[in-house]
Amino acid sequence: MSNSLSSQIFTRKMLICAFTGFNSGLPLFVLSQMLPVWLTDKHLSIELIGAVTGVMLPYGLKFLWAPLLDRYFPSFLGRRRSWMLLSQVALLILLYIISLFDPLTQLGTVANIALLIAFFSATQDIVLDAYRREILSDHELGLGNTIHINAYRIAGLIPGGLSLYLAAIYPWETVFLWTALCMLAGIFMTLFLAKEPKIDMQQTNQPFYQAFWIPLQEFFQRKGVIQAIGFLLFLFLYKFGDSFATTLQTKFIYDMGFSKEDIAIVVKSTALWSSILSGLAGGMIMLKLGINRALWLFGLVQMVTIGGFIWLAAFGHFDVITSAELWKLGVVIAAEYIGVGLGTAAFVAFMARESNPLYTATQLALFTSLSALPSKVLGILSGYVVGAVGYYQYFWFCLFLAIPGMLCLFWVAPLKQENNKTSSV
């Protein structure tokens, strides 16, 4: 058993999954964790900071250009690796350039650059998701996506932890440069680790409207209209509550009275071990229980962890930060990393299982877009909601938003049914 598990984990494919997770997570966490603290340091209001989160909308709309990445691609590295490299180089450059402008006087420029970061990050996600689905067998999806998700979460330790610690010592421009250079890990993977998968390229010769329509048609024919609609509704709702809760997570912690150094130290000390714990547990649980049962179990865990933010918000602003306050923050952050990490791992494995390998880019982009769209659209209003009712009521609202997604599991992932086969054309 031990040797069998080790032989599944320590492979080139799983190493690539770790790299895809890290490079997918880094730019997103810059926008969701590092950017709000930078804007707060520049004395922008909570309403403006919440509105700026609207730049993350490309994550919810990436299905619109996903067919282009299947159909058109530079020839120098192949269909997947060419787009990987182009998006990663663009992100490396943009993550530094954004720091050259003052948000207080040039907020429009900063927002536009952040929008470009989100666009290239979403583009990278399209290709990385498709690539990962193409290199992993159905049996490897649970473990591979667990490794991807936890590397994705660990990537958040840089903009959400180490970079904030450095920001207390160095100018923000230096911090953004250091953070941007971390994208070199993805460039290394693309050039030296990843190999172009061998996939039937017949669909790339079709007219563009067919490249967009046929993957959707295949999905609805395979699932049936009613089941397909239920599946898409589930994608829309399952991560709604916890995604909305974490939209202003770093801003919330900052407003509670914790310094950048406090956030960095606590995140560094708790998020790493909790990510590793959830990664090991999540992969083994999915191998044992299957994806459907994992969705139920992990969904309940991620919903309960929203309660941690409610508990912390109930204390109000801390005038003095002692070890007791740091301990409280550590408990909440650890629970959040475990809960969201587990829930996301099962969710991503579920989406990958339901996609057809011939149309991975378009179908996975549609699936992940639907899961991201609610929080990205309503995230624009998050600052105004907090400004109107406060953090305590806001997190209660997020908890109730998580319930409809759990109810959808009765429809799309019954406990007594486990489909481990991915349909193909």
From Swiss-Prot:
Q: Which GO terms describe its cellular component?
A: plasma membrane
Keyword Signal on entry = no
TM regions (residue ranges): 15-35, 48-68, 84-104, 107-127, 149-169, 174-194, 225-245, 271-291, 295-315, 331-351, 370-390, 395-415
Record localization: Cell inner membrane
UniProt GO molecular function: transmembrane transporter activity
What keywords is this UniProt entry annotated with?
Cell inner membrane, Cell membrane, Membrane, Transmembrane, Transmembrane helix, Transport
Q: Which InterPro entries match?
A: AmpG_permease/AT-1, MFS, MFS_trans_sf
Write the protein's name.
Uncharacterized protein HI_0350
- Species this protein is from: Haemophilus influenzae (strain ATCC 51907 / DSM 11121 / KW20 / Rd)
Q: Which SUPFAM superfamilies match?
A: MFS general substrate transporter
Matches recorded under NCBIfam families: 2A0125 (TIGR00901)
Upon changing residue 32 to L, the result is: In strain: RM 7004
Question: What is the similarity comment for this entry?
Answer: To E.coli AmpG and yeast YBR220c.
Its placement in the membrane is given as: Multi-pass membrane protein
